[in-house]
Regions:
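Amphipathic, Lys/Arg- and hydrophobic-enriched alpha-helical face
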Residues: 30-53, 68-72, 150, 195, ...
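Helix-turn-helix DNA-binding module
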Residues: 9, 15, 148-159, 163, ...
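Arg/Lys-rich amphipathic alpha helix in sigma70-family domain 2
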Residues: 72, 87-112, 116, 124, ...
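C-terminal edge and immediately downstream basic/flexible tail or linker adjoining helix-turn-helix-like DNA-binding
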Residues: 2, 115, 120-121, 176-177, ...
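Conserved RNAP core-binding helix
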Residues: 8-14, 30-31, 50-71, 167
Length: 210
């Protein structure tokens, strides 16, 4: 996870065709990233949004927006295509959140919990060692506390955690998506992990368990 992988020769070829207005070439290229984008969206939909938003709809809207913005992207080429799609999907999801949770945020504050599955996956990564029986039982308690602690993080901190731990992005790649320097992404990730660990320790977990 140390750097940025450039676009493949095949991707560049399809982008060249799409630049001439070949919608089929763009759709073929987007299709290669569809599953990854859907997974990224699913990881970020909490219970309030899941009842209202279909991840496939967000991905479809991302595809339409990306095609409309493709000429600008091809003119500037600010980042590899897959990261640009990831950034476009992230921005689309933020718009969906603002639209659907505007009233909920006013009523319940700014906390946004990750889906339970995301909390469990992060709990597995934070627990030291292998999946012993005690750790298996503790995982769900960690996940419960993580859901609360993650809701207290800033949006940017949560995103860095997801991009690093679930999507395997490097700090430079995270920086592209979030429009921050790689060094800032590294610091943000470190602060987020520290805050989560402090919360778990305050909740009764031992340092050796984390």
């Amino acid at each position: 996870m140390g750097g940025v992988h450039p676009d493949s020769t095949e991707t560049q070829s399809l982008l060249g065709q799409a630049q001439t207005g070949d919608r089929q070439a763009f759709d073929e290229l987007f299709g290669r990233h569809r599953d990854a984008l859907r997974r990224a969206v699913e990881l970020r939909l909490d219970a309030r949004l899941r009842a209202r938003v279909d991840p496939s709809d967000v991905v479809q809207e991302t595809q339409l927006e990306a095609f409309q913005r493709l000429p600008d992207y091809l003119e500037r080429r600010p980042m590899p295509f897959r990261l640009w799609l990831r950034k476009t999907a992230y921005e689309r999801l933020l718009k969906v959140r603002r639209h659907h949770l505007k009233t909920a945020r006013r009523a319940a504050g700014r906390e946004v919990a990750l889906p339970h599955e995301s909390s469990l996956l992060l709990a597995e990564q934070l627990l030291a060692g292998g999946p012993t029986p005690s750790q298996h039982a503790a995982k769900h308690e960690v996940a419960r506390q993580l859901r609360t602690a993650l809701g207290e993080l800033s949006e940017g901190q949560r995103e860095v955690l997801l991009m690093r731990n679930f999507e395997g992005l490097s700090y430079q790649e995270v920086g592209y998506v979030l429009d921050i320097d790689p060094a800032a992404a590294r610091k943000r990730y470190g602060r987020a992990l520290l805050q989560l660990r402090q919360r778990l320790l305050a909740g009764g977990f031992r340092e050796s368990e984390l």
